[in-house]
A protein has these predicted regions:
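Aromatic sugar-binding surface patches on proteins
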Residues: 308-320, 407-425
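Beta-strand-rich structural segments
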Residues: 280-284, 333-334, 365-382, 434-436
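Extended substrate-binding grooves/exosites of carbohydrate-active enzymes
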Residues: 1-325, 329-339
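Extracellular Ig-like/FN3 beta-sandwich strand-entry sites
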Residues: 325-329, 366, 431-433
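Edge beta-strands of extracellular beta-sandwich domains
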Residues: 339-350, 442-450
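Low-complexity, Pro/Ser/Thr- and charge-rich linker/hinge segments at domain boundaries
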Residues: 346-364
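Short flexible loop/turn segments that cap and initiate beta-strands
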Residues: 285-303, 344, 376-407
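Short, solvent-exposed loop/linker segments at the N-terminal edge
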Residues: 271-276, 361-367
Length: 450
C-alpha cells in the first residue's frame, strides 16, 4: 500500500520479488547482518480501507502464487495482508534460511495482519513499550525486540529547565508545535508525541528479560524529518550524535550503561546569568556515587536510585543537582569504595580568544577536524557563534563542513561555517595544513599528514 503518491508501491507488483532477492543475495555474506526485516510500519498491518487497499494485481499475485490445493484451504482463512507477509518471508528464506525474519510494526496488537501471518521469527515493536508486559501472552515462544525506539528530541548544547519536566512535542502528532528557537532540550526530557525519553525506553529493555534489545531512533541526526518543527528546520533532532558528528549528552548515558571502562560526563556548561537556577546532571559508571563542587564547596554526593525521590534530580541512570549559578568552576568526582574513579571540571569561559583544531577522526583518505572557539585558557565558549573560514595548502581539499545546527542553511561544501554552541566540523581530504580564521579570533592551524 502506498504511503505517499510516488513511493515504491507504484513498482511493487513488478519489482518486489527481484528487489528483495537481490537484497538478500547482495548482503547475506556480511557478518553484520543479524536478521532480515520485510517491512517497516507498512499499512498492511491493518485492514482499514481508510489507509488505501491492496490493488487487484497485488491480491492476484499473492492468491495465485503457486499454492497447491491443500495450502490454499489453509491460507484462505488468512487475509491478503497476511498472505503477502508469508510471500515476502518465503522469498527471504529461499536465499537465506540461516537468519530470522522480523518486521518493524507500529501496531502492537496481536491482531496485526503481519503477526497473524505466522511468518515472523522475531516480533518487532516500533515504540509502544506500554504493550511489552503482554508480549509473553500475546506471542508465546517468540523472541522480541524493539525494532525502532525512543525518538527523543535534542539539540546539542541547548537546555530547557527545570530538567525534571518532560516536554512532549507536539502533544499530539497532528498538532503544530512552535518555539522561536527551533531547538529541543539536550537533557533527556523531550520527546515526540508517539515516543519516550532514552531513559524510559532503556529501562524497559534493561529490566525485561524477554526484550532482546532495541534499535534507537536514531544514532545520528539526518537530513529531513525535523520533528517537531517545520521550515526553517531541515534536519532531525532524533540523534544521540548531531549531524556534524558531535555527541549529544545522552550519548554518554548509553556509554555509562554499555561500557566497562570508567567514565564520567558532567553537563551542561558553566556560562549562565548570575543567580540563575541551573540543573547539573552527570552520567557515570564503575562508581558508587558522584560528588559535585562549585568553586570548591561541596553540593553533596549523589548516587543513582531506582525509586524516584522528588527532592533529588536522580534516576537509575543519572544523578543531578539543582544549584544557583556563580561564575568559576564546577567539578564532579566519582568514587567507588571511597576512592576516586573519575573527575571532570567545567570552568566559566571568558571572552572568545582563539580557534582550537583537533583531529576527531582520520580515515584512509579523509580527516574530520573538530573546530572549537575557546577563551585564552582553552575553555570552550558555549555561546560562540563566530563565522569561521577555512583554507588548506598542499594536496589537501576541504570536502565538507557542518555544525550540527538543525536550521543552518549553509552549504555543506562551503569552506566556511558558523560555530554552533562553540563548535563546528570540517572534513579534509589529503595532506596539508588546515587554517581556521575568524575576524575576532586568533587563527587555528593544524598539520594533516597520513
Amino acid at each position: 500500500r502506498k504511503k505517499t503518491q510516488n513511493d515504491y508501491a507504484r513498482f511493487f507488483d513488478e519489482w518486489h520479488e527481484r528487489d528483495l532477492s537481490d537484497l538478500i543475495l547482495r548482503d547475506r555474506n556480511h557478518p553484520s547482518i543479524l536478521m532480515w526485516s520485510i517491512g517497516n510500519e507498512v499499512l498492511e498491518q491493518w485492514s482499514s480501507a481508510e489507509a488505501d487497499t491492496l490493488t487487484l494485481e497485488q491480491a492476484n499475485l499473492i492468491l495465485n502464487a503457486g499454492h497447491d490445493a491443500s495450502t490454499l484451504a489453509k491460507d484462505g482463512e488468512l487475509s491478503v495482508q497476511s498472505l503477502l507477509t508469508q510471500h515476502l518471508a518465503e522469498i527471504v528464506r529461499r536465499y537465506d534460511s540461516s537468519r530470522p525474519i522480523t518486521a518493524g510494526c507500529n501496531e502492537p496488537n496481536p491482531g496485526n495482519h503481519l503477526f497473524k501471518s505466522g511468518a515472523l521469527d522475531i516480533i518487532g515493536f516500533n515504540y509502544h513499550h506500554e504493550w511489552v508486559p503482554g508480549v509473553p501472552q500475546n506471542f508465546p515462544g517468540k523472541p522480541f525486540i524493539f525494532s525502532e525506539s525512543v525518538s527523543a528530541l535534542q539539540t546539542r548544547g541547548y537546555y530547557m529547565m527545570p530538567s525534571d519536566t518532560v516536554y512532549k512535542a507536539p502533544k499530539e502528532w497532528w498538532l503544530p508545535y512552535t518555539d522561536p528557537t527551533y531547538m529541543c532540550s539536550a537533557y533527556d526530557n523531550m520527546h515526540a508525541s508517539w515516543s519516550s525519553t532514552h531513559e524510559e525506553t532503556w529501562d524497559v529493555v534493561k529490566h525485561t528479560p524477554y526484550v532482546g534489545g532495541q534499535y534507537i531512533w536514531t544514532g545520528f541526526d539526518y537530513i529531513g524529518e525535523p520533528t517537531p518543527y517545520g521550515f526553517p528546520a531541515r534536519s532531525s533532532y532524533f540523534g544521540i550524535i548531531d549531524l556534524a558528528g558531535f555527541p549529544k549528552d545522552t550519548y554518554y548515558m548509553y556509554q555509562s550503561e554499555w561500557t566497562a571502562k570508567p567514565m564520567l560526563h558532567l553537563f551542561p556548561h558553566w556560562n549562565w546569568l548570575p543567580g540563575q537556577t541551573i540543573d547539573l546532571w552527570a552520567y557515570y559508571n564503575q562508581a558508587d556515587e558522584v560528588e559535585l563542587f562549585i568553586n570548591g564547596k561541596s553540593q553533596g554526593a549523589r548516587r543513582k536510585i531506582t525509586q524516584k525521590e522528588p527532592s533529588l534530580l536522580c534516576t537509575e541512570y543519572h544523578v543531578g543537582w539543582r544549584v544557583m549559578y556563580e561564575p568559576g568552576e564546577v567539578k564532579a568526582v566519582s568514587r567507588k569504595g571511597g576512592k576516586t574513579v573519575c573527575e571532570q571540571t567545567i570552568k566559566t569561559a571568558g571572552t572568545p580568544h582563539h580557534i582550537r583544531l583537533t583531529t576527531d577522526y582520520q580515515g584512509k583518505e579523509t580527516t574530520f577536524v573538530a573546530v572549537e572557539v575557546v577563551d585564552q585558557d582553552g575553555n570552550l565558549c558555549p555561546w560562540a557563534e563566530d563565522q569561521i573560514f577555512f583554507t588548506v595548502d598542499g594536496d589537501a581539499e576541504i570536502i565538507g563542513t557542518d555544525n550540527g545546527c538543525q536550521t543552518s542553511m549553509e552549504n555543506f561544501k562551503a569552506p566556511q561555517r558558523k560555530a554552533f554552541f562553540g563548535k563546528c566540523m570540517v572534513v579534509v581530504k589529503g595532506n596539508g595544513t588546515l587554517k581556521a580564521q575568524s575576524p575576532m579570533l586568533k587563527t587555528g592551524e593544524l598539520r594533516i599528514k597520513r
